[in-house]
Structure formats: C-alpha cells, structure tokens
Swiss-Prot record:
Pfam families tied to this protein: Citrate_synt (PF00285)
Gene: gltA
Pathway: Carbohydrate metabolism; tricarboxylic acid cycle; isocitrate from oxaloacetate: step 1/2
Family statement: Belongs to the citrate synthase family.
Name of the protein this chain belongs to: Citrate synthase
Keyword Transferase: yes
Length: 435
C-alpha cells in the first residue's frame, strides 16, 4: 500500500556508532507522520525497542482515524458521533469493509446477504453440549467460532475472491453463536434467527425469546444497542485487532483469525473492562463511599483501580463515552429507572468528582467507552458475563475490515517482532546428578 501524500525528500537522521542513517518520513493524510525504520535492522545491525508498541505503526490503513488528544474518532473519514446518531450498524459495517457508504440498492443487497448467512450448521449444536453449564459464554463463543473452520474447509486455502463473502458470513454468524452461547449457559433452548427482523432486532430475539414466548423488541432498546454496536465496530490497531492481523499475516484461515481476536478481547484490560466497571460500582455500593474509593484509586499501594477511566490513546473525553452517556439516560428513562437506578447515580457522581480532581485532570483520565456501556446492558437485562460477547459481535466488523485490508496490502508480510535478549549468554549442560 502506498500513500500518495508521502514525500521522499523528508528524512529523519539516526546516528548509531558514529554512522548516520537517513530514515524516510512517511506522511499521514491526517495525524502523526511516521518514521520508516523497516531497513534499520539490515543496515545498522540493531533493532528498535518499543514495549507495548506505543510508538510503532505496524501498517498503513485507511479504515479508522483517532486523535486521542482532541477526542476524535472517524471511520473512513466520518465522525463516530454522526454515524452513531444517523446510521445503523450494517451500514457502518458496509462502510468499513468496502470503504464507502452504500447506495440504497447496495444496502438492501448487503442486509439480505447477512440475513441469508445467519444460520449455523446444525452439527455445531453438539459442540455446545460438550461444555459444562457454568461455562463462561466467551469460552463457548471462542471455541464455536474457531470450529467454523471445520464447516468451511474451502476457506482453509482462501483466495481474494473469498474476502467479501467471508466477511459477510462472519458478521452474520457471530450474533447467532453469541446468542447460542448465552442460551446454553442458562439452560434454555437455542432460538433460530428470524430473517424478517433487522440485525439488532434479530439478536435481541435470539437472546430473549423462548419457544413458548415471543420477545417484543422495544425500539428504544433496539436503537441503543444499534448505537453500542456502531461505537464498538472498530478502533484502529488495538490489542485484538493487532492480534487478528498478526494471525492473518501467517495465512491462517479467517475463522481462526477471528477466534484469536475474541481471545484477546476477553482480557479485562481490553473488552472485559465494562464488566469490571459494573463490578467496581457494586463494590462502591453507594454514593457516600465515592470519596473513599477515589482516595484508594490515588494510593499507588492500594490494588483498587478506577475502572472505565483513562485510555491508551485518548487523552481527552472518549467521543464514544459521550454518546453512551446520553444513550444510557434514554434507555433508563424508557424503562422508568432514570431517577432511581443506583448504577447510573453512582456513575454520574463518580464522573463529576473525578473530572474536578487534579489527580485525574493532570493524568488526563476521562471516562472511556466502557464506563456507561455496562450500565446500559444491565438495564436491558443482559447479564455481565455477556458484555464482552456483545463487544465481539460489534468488533467482528472491524476485524474483518482490517483482515481484508491486510491481505490486499502488498507490503504486508508475516509478522515477526524482535526482542531485546537479556538472559544468560551461554551455559554448559550438566547431568541431573551433577546439579
């Protein structure tokens, strides 16, 4: 992939052992430029060191742009707030995968294809029965998504012509598997997709309907979940997306790649953070105890951490959190809980106190996307163990867009990070009786 804005006349100079190396500066269309260090190891006989890849761009991408200092998030140039307020999830999915918003005909064809592929193979049901009833839905989902490789053996050696259909299949089947994971975890029968419903309605139907009870979708709840899905659809090169790209760089089949993304997302520092926020609010218990927990958060010797605040990229208010705060109020108002929901009351007071505290201001710790999403889920009747599962439904769109872009990029190679070795130089082996 080449960037038309790159100016080969600009270089950075790196001096190593008295020798100067000229490194090209690659120009971004917006945001920070990048120093190309790809030739350093070959020419200077050394590597760069960047724990956590905080200063490393692993790829060029046209999908998502983030300005953490200004609190900006854009997909293909469109502001996230505009997409959340004016679009729907499958339209955003189309945008991320194809690069442009669809026409009416393109949108209709795309949604029909997603609906057509929402069923999963009946034999997958037997896989669910191998799990104990107490299994976490993320564990079940992780195994089920990886097992799709067995049902689509033709994609073990996929071709460029398979990219789009693969993305559609993945977007369609992940919600079905997610709902099945939930149903199995609570001992209820699986509910089949209903193609007369839209994407978000269908997921709620599979989650909450039973063979003897029809679930009527509340439009406020549906719209809120639609926004949540949009806000979680992609977020540049985060841990799970980078994991998908790294797995994909080896040529692994797309189902295996997405399962690695799900595994990475499950971590409490990534997709599991919204569940941690709910647990934190439960621990705080009442607004009167907020000052106590603020003090605990400031104490470096105290293991307590204020969940839902701060972000590796954002040093301003997360634009997704701003949308979710208002969405949370809309949902609770619809459900008659706006004035008496203890989770919202604690969250709002906690945010207000933290945003006025110099400790948090100096460290630029603002509410992130996880701070309010869990409260919305809980109000909807979605249990906390399903929070990260819903995150995975939304992020599958971003993972597939990034996976597709990676395979279309001629510059991409199999990922192979290097290390700074600090272990023993050499040791002689001794038999066990001599040690």
């Amino acid at each position: 992939m080449t960037n038309e804005n790159n100016n080969d006349s600009e270089f950075a100079e790196l001096k190593i052992r008295g020798k100067i190396f000229k490194l090209p500066i690659l120009k971004a269309s917006i945001g920070e430029d990048v120093i190309d260090i790809s030739r350093v190891s070959a020419e200077a006989d050394c590597f760069t060191y960047d724990p956590g890849f905080m200063s490393t761009a692993s790829c060029q991408s046209t999908i998502t742009y983030i300005d953490g200092d200004k609190g900006i998030l854009r997909h293909r140039g469109y502001d996230i707030k505009d997409l959340a307020e004016k679009s729907d999830f499958l339209e955003v999915a189309y945008l991320l995968i194809y690069g442009e918003l669809p026409s009416g005909e393109q949108y209709n064809n795309f949604t029909k294809q997603v609906a057509h592929h929402s069923l999963v193979n009946e034999r997958l049901h037997y896989l669910f029965q191998t799990f104990c009833s107490s299994s976490h839905p993320m564990a079940i989902m992780l195994a089920a998504v990886g097992s799709l490789s067995a049902f689509y053996p033709d994609l073990l050696n996929f071709k460029e012509a398979d990219y789009e259909l693969t993305a559609i299949r993945m977007i369609a089947k992940i919600p079905t598997i997610a709902a099945m994971s939930y149903k199995y975890s609570i001992g209820q029968p699986f509910i089949y997709p209903d193609n007369s419903l839209d994407f978000t309605e269908n997921f709620l139907h599979m989650m909450f309907a039973t063979p003897c009870t029809k679930y009527t979708v509340n439009p406020i709840i549906k719209n809120a979940l639609n926004k949540i899905f949009i806000l979680h659809a992609d977020h540049e090169q985060n841990a799970s997306t980078s994991t998908v790209r790294i797995a994909g760089s080896s040529g692994a089949n797309p189902f295996a790649c997405i399962s690695t993304g799900i595994a990475s997302l499950w971590g409490p520092a990534h997709g599991g953070a919204n569940e941690a926020v709910i647990n934190m609010i439960k621990e705080i218990g009442s607004s009167e105890y907020i000052p106590k927990y603020i003090a605990k958060a400031k104490d470096k010797n105290d293991p307590f951490r204020l969940m839902g605040f701060g972000h590796r990229v954002y040093k301003n208010y997360d634009p997704r959190a701003a949308v979710l705060k208002e969405t949370c109020k809309e949902v609770l108002k619809e459900l008659g809980q706006l004035d008496n929901n203890p989770f919202l009351q604690i969250a709002i007071e906690l945010e207000a106190i933290a945003l006025k505290d110099e400790y948090f201001i100096e460290r630029k710790l603002y509410p992130n996307v996880d701070f309010y999403s869990g409260i919305i889920y809980k109000a909807m009747g979605i249990p906390s163990q399903m929070f990260t599962v819903l995150f995975a439904i939304a992020r599958t769109v971003g993972w597939m867009a990034q996976w597709k872009e990676m395979h279309e990029d001629p510059e991409q190679k199999i990922s192979r990070p290097r290390q700074l070795y600090t272990g023993y130089v050499h040791r002689e082996y001794k038999g066990i009786r001599e040690r």
